[in-house]
Amino acid sequence: MDKLRVLYDEFVTISKDNLERETGLSASDVDMDFDLNIFMTLVPVLEKKVCVITPTIEDDKIVTMMKYCSYQSFSFWFLKSGAVVKSVYNKLDDVEKEKFVATFRDMLLNVQTLISLNSMYTRLRQDTEDIVSDSKKIIEIVSHLRASTTENAAYQVLQQNNSFIISTLNKILSDENYLLKIIAVFDSKLISEKETLNEYKQLYTISSESLVYGIRCVSNLDISSVQLSNNKYVLFVKKMLPKIILFQNNDINAQQFANVISKIYTLIYRQLTSNVDVGCLLTDTIESTKTKISIEKIKQTGINNVQSLIKFISDNKKEYKTIISEEYLSKEDRIITILQNIVNEHDIKYDNKLLNMRDLIVTFRERYSYKF
């Protein structure tokens, strides 16, 4: 929103100076909210008349769009004259024209984002009731699983809730904003503050394309040295995944994915319970974190459920992001060494090549760390 405000101010300043000079009239007071509503109405019209607005849209298309934007619709020139944005563009020198086009393009792109946020904002409100119902059911299932004393009892819980689990997974995997909606149930700031919504959207929105790519990458891992555990949980997952629409529509081998996930789970459990290096790393991290986090502050907050926990994390997000970042960066080399040793020991391959954990982690950090 701050960037949009700067772009809007630049647009208004250039426009007012030229309009007043050419007409001899004085501009009215500026009302940004009023004008943004006008732009939000204009953008779909411009896209229909000219073309879709993208970061790579050509300058001549932007200039064409200027012909359809009349200044008399905006607060600072309301009903004064029939001048269009292109008439101001025509009065500028070449350097000014280039800057004006860039400003107008970026402003339209930011308005486009605002339209998307408004739409999501509306849907978040509408979907809250369903999300609350789903969340309660999920918590209930987890509670029953934790209370199960045998594998058969836990399997029965999963079987009894089979239809709900499949329908919920289909909803989650078909809606890139589903995770965001679940968070909105517990953190009301997403409903009341659009800037917070935009920040969370960048962090928690996951596209179907990204999911499919990630699932394929995991499926293609070769972990043949780890024995497959065909327990009842794995059998349940294997029966369930073929019914997931994302797997059906993208021709993903559900059995292969389930097998790899089972092996990864077995491997992680084994490392957590028997790998001395992993144990030392976790202990050192916990001890180091204790010196940076105020336990008293957490106690005073009175965290007693998921909602209060998410609110606490949201309110202290910057502080904990800094702590996590410092902890990770100070231990990155150690983490990579431990993971590479595990990969080497179990001969884990992708595309017939041994996984290079340093390349993988550094690439991920460089591409996606800005989100976190």
Curated annotation (Swiss-Prot):
Keyword Lipoprotein: no
Database matches in InterPro entries: Poxvirus_A6
Entry keyword set: Host cytoplasm, Virion
Coiled-coil ranges (or none): none
Tagged with keyword Transport: no
Subcellular location: Host cytoplasm; Virion
Any Pfam family matching the protein: Pox_A6
Main subcellular localisation: host cell
Superkingdom, natural source: Viruses
Family: Belongs to the orthopoxvirus OPG132 family.
Domain statement: The N-terminal domain is not required for crescent formation but is required for virion formation.
The protein's role, per its UniProt record: Lipid-bound viral membrane assembly protein that plays an essential role in immature virion (IV) to mature virion (MV) transition. Functions in both crescent-shaped viral membranes formation and its enclosure to form immature virions. In addition, participates in targeting mature virion proteins to sites of virion assembly to ensure their correct localization.
Full protein name: Virion morphogenesis protein OPG132
Organism: Monkeypox virus
Underlying gene: OPG132
